Curated annotation (Swiss-Prot):
Residues 2-31, 37-68 form the 4Fe-4S ferredoxin-type domain. It comes from Prochlorococcus marinus (strain MIT 9301). It is a peripheral membrane protein. GO terms for biological process: photosynthetic electron transport in photosystem I. This is Photosystem I iron-sulfur center. Gene3D superfamilies: 3.30.70.20.
Length: 81
């Protein structure tokens, strides 16, 4: 089952979320917006099972990665009208 995975620009490039994902949904890509020079990316969201291990692993105060399940996607990402 596919879930929406949102990476926020508060990502510090630490790779914790990538290492925590049991299905390799995430990867790091080059990005000049942080000191690490990389940011998490979610190219394989169709493989996401919604375990949210990536969220748990994120060390930032404001979670830099969020997994949205079903109807939660529309409400939480501001997509509901």
């Amino acid at each position: 089952m596919s879930h929406a995975v949102k990476i926020y620009d508060t990502c510090i490039g630490c790779t914790q979320c990538v290492r925590a994902c049991p299905l390799d949904v995430l990867e790091m890509v080059p990005w000049d917006g942080c000191k690490a020079g990389q940011i998490a990316s979610s190219p394989r969201t169709e493989d996401c099972v919604g375990c949210k291990r990536c969220e748990t692993a994120c060390p930032t105060d404001f979670l830099s990665i969020r997994v949205y399940l079903g109807d939660e996607t529309s409400r939480s990402m501001g997509l509901a009208y």
